[in-house]
Regions:
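Short, surface-exposed acidic-centric catalytic microdomains
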Residues: 35-76
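Short, well-structured alpha-helical segments in soluble
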Residues: 76-85
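Alpha-helical structural signal in soluble globular domains
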Residues: 26-31, 52, 56, 81, ...
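Short, basic/aromatic-enriched C-terminal tail that caps enzymatic domains
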Residues: 22, 200-216
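Donor/substrate-binding cores of folate-linked one-carbon enzymes
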Residues: 27, 89, 93-206
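N-terminal Rossmann-like dinucleotide-binding module
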Residues: 1-48, 52
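A general structural signal for well-ordered alpha-helical segments in protein cores
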Residues: 18-21, 49-50, 75, 128, ...
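N-terminal glycine-rich "phosphate-gripper" loop used for MgATP/nucleotide binding
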Residues: 42-43, 67, 71, 85-101
Length: 216
């Protein structure tokens, strides 16, 4: 088990609305989630998530993509910003940049992402529309450790919902997002308690290799 003398620490990386960030903030405020978010970092100065962070009195940092057209320079600046806080975890919450392999390697086992599909199905973008067009019966979201291959890291937790006959991609996205707000904090709780660990490039639960993601 992890023995954090104080709350575990994290930085959260966002690009947009930050609703998953807000789910974290609400549970932290309610004393349910024992996590101290040290900073919220965005690559978009207009991200609404920055406003959410400021309202919660969390430090915000903006590293604008257009100022760093070179991916290596952007990742270096991002790494410097994260290292100022030395967090236990780095949560990607709608962070739309693909991180370079050497960046991911540096923080291996500490970076967590949430993705709007039942991975390994539908990595990448436009997951809801792709699921509908493929006549899937089920769709959902996944939390996973971030590795060098995009959306391919060890799965930790998933939640699935049925695709309804009248579902549009927008309707489906709203319903999936509600599940994201549940499983991302739940995953954080398991990480903080030490029940979930990253070892040998795999996810482990209570000392046992996690053969398949926890379904919630």
């Amino acid at each position: 088990m992890n023995n954090f003398n104080q709350n575990a620490t994290a930085t959260v990386l966002i690009s947009g609305g930050g609703s998953n960030l807000q789910a974290f903030i609400d549970l932290i405020s309610s004393k349910i989630l024992k996590l101290n978010i040290l900073a919220v970092i965005s690559d978009n100065k207009n991200a609404h998530g920055l406003i959410r962070a400021k309202k919660a009195k969390i430090k915000t940092i903006c590293i604008e993509s257009k100022k760093y057209p070179n991916k290596k320079n952007f990742d270096q600046k991002l790494s410097e910003s994260i290292d100022m806080f030395d967090p236990n975890f780095i949560f990607l919450a709608g962070f739309m940049r693909i991180l370079r392999k050497d960046f991911v390697k540096k923080y291996e086992g500490k970076i967590i992402n949430i993705h709007p599909s039942l991975l390994p199905k539908y990595p990448g973008l436009n997951t809801h529309q792709r699921a509908i067009e493929s006549n899937e019966k089920w769709h959902g979201c996944s939390v996973h450790f971030v590795t060098e291959e995009v959306d391919q890291g060890p799965l930790i937790m998933q939640s699935k919902i049925p695709i309804l006959n009248n579902d549009s991609s927008d309707k489906l996205a709203i319903r999936v997002l509600k599940r994201e707000h549940i499983i991302y904090p739940k995953t954080a709780e398991l990480l903080i308690s030490g029940r979930i660990k990253y070892k040998n490039s795999q996810a482990w639960l209570d000392g046992q290799l996690l053969q398949k993601p926890i379904m919630l």
